[in-house]
């Protein structure tokens, strides 16, 4: 699940959930930013099991917005206008529980429509290469921001300090029309401290509604934070604890101590892997080969400590995947003893009652011992990834493709 917006020569790579990040739902992003002085439309969150009371809604007309952790919702039917309570009800029925982009819409935000004179764009993105923050402004925002001409996008990198970032916004905003420039600068002065205080990876307002009065309102808000900062971010920590269904991946990581993300509920290949970078590369390899991975996992073999609990838990999660047909184990071990790992794996497979075929690709220390353990369990061991993928294809009935 990669999220990115390409603004011609400026590309914002919205970090994937398994990059130790927490992608907030729009409603939560707006509620959090409102606490930092950001103007947002009045709205309410409605869940699948909520009793809907029209009297708690703000005055209409409204926007009905399905809540998923992804951009481009307007293009997939998750952002609709409503002029009446009946239209709201119809949209809620259509959106709640809908399967979209590998997940389900668990909640909908109903908020006031905003009558804007103009739609602009402002974003702040952590720039790992420079150690700074990239500031991006445009006088043209909205659903088709990717199509904005190059000369209307203004970007620069500044140090992660309030004064430096605000100054960067002011300098870039000189390139915008006067009324839009003033609104963008004002919004930037409030967004900068919010970005830093939240320890965010990305804060993006698109569109930033510029009003006839010269004021502004955040039409949509995208916030991605570093989930390693949760112990310092009480509001975010509370979200994870009280809304586990909405932030299941982050909740799992902080409860169990490793990264596990279901990337595609329709995925056919369960992955037992270690190393975040290698695991992401494997997912890319599978997709490029036309195969469908079910999950991302960085099991962190060093944390097993001779116990099967972590492996068993992961295998149970993978086994719950309705479409999963084969398990691919891909471990590149430096310090980890592959013989010991294989013994733990075989025990965990038995404990978790895994009945699907298992293909193992192992590289590293004590490989011969691993082979001796896996062979009696009927698990073929490969050291070459292509050979392992060929075995996976055969189990999926795709051996001749």
What are these model-derived regions, one by one?
Residues 3-4, 8-9, 13-14, 18-19:
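Intrinsically disordered, low-complexity repeat/linker tracts enriched for polar/charged residues
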Residues 21-205, 209-326, 363-401:
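ATP-dependent carboxylate/acyl-activation modules
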């Amino acid at each position: 699940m990669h999220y990115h917006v390409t603004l011609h020569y400026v590309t914002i790579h919205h970090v994937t959930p398994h990059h130790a990040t927490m992608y907030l739902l729009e409603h939560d992003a707006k509620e959090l930013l409102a606490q930092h002085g950001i103007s947002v439309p009045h709205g309410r969150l409605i869940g699948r099991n909520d009793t809907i009371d029209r009297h708690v809604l703000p005055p209409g007309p409204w926007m009905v917005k399905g809540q998923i952790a992804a951009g481009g919702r307007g293009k997939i039917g998750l952002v609709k206008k409503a002029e009446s309570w009946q239209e709201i009800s119809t949209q809620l029925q259509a959106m709640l529980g809908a399967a979209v982009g590998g997940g389900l819409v668990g909640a909908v935000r109903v908020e006031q429509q905003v009558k804007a004179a103009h739609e602009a764009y402002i974003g702040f993105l952590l720039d790992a290469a420079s150690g700074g923050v990239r500031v991006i402004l445009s006088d043209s925002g909205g659903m088709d921001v990717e199509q904005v001409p190059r000369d209307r996008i203004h970007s620069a990198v500044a140090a992660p300090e309030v004064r430096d970032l605000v100054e960067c916004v002011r300098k870039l905003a000189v390139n915008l029309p006067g009324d839009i420039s003033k609104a963008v600068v004002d919004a930037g002065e409030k967004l900068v401290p919010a970005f830093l205080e939240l320890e965010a990876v990305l804060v993006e307002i698109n569109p930033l509604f510029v009003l006839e009065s010269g004021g502004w309102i955040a039409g949509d808000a995208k916030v991605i934070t570093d989930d390693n900062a949760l112990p310092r971010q009480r509001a975010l920590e509370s979200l994870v604890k009280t809304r586990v269904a909405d932030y299941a991946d982050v909740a799992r990581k902080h409860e169990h101590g490793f990264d596990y993300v279901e990337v595609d509920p329709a995925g056919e290949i369960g992955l037992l892997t270690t190393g975040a970078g290698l695991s992401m590369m494997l997912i890319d390899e599978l997709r490029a080969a036309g195969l469908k991975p079910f999950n991302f996992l960085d099991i962190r073999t060093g944390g097993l400590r001779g116990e099967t609990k972590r492996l068993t838990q992961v295998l149970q999660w993978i086994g719950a995947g309705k479409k999963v047909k084969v398990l691919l184990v891909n471990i590149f071990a430096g310090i980890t003893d592959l013989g010991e790992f294989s013994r733990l794996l075989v025990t965990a497979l038995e404990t978790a009652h895994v009945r699907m075929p298992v293909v193992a690709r192992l590289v590293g220390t004590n490989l011969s011992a691993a082979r001796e353990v896996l062979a009696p369990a009927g698990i073929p061991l490969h050291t070459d990834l292509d050979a392992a993928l060929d075995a996976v294809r055969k189990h999926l009935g795709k051996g001749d493709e």
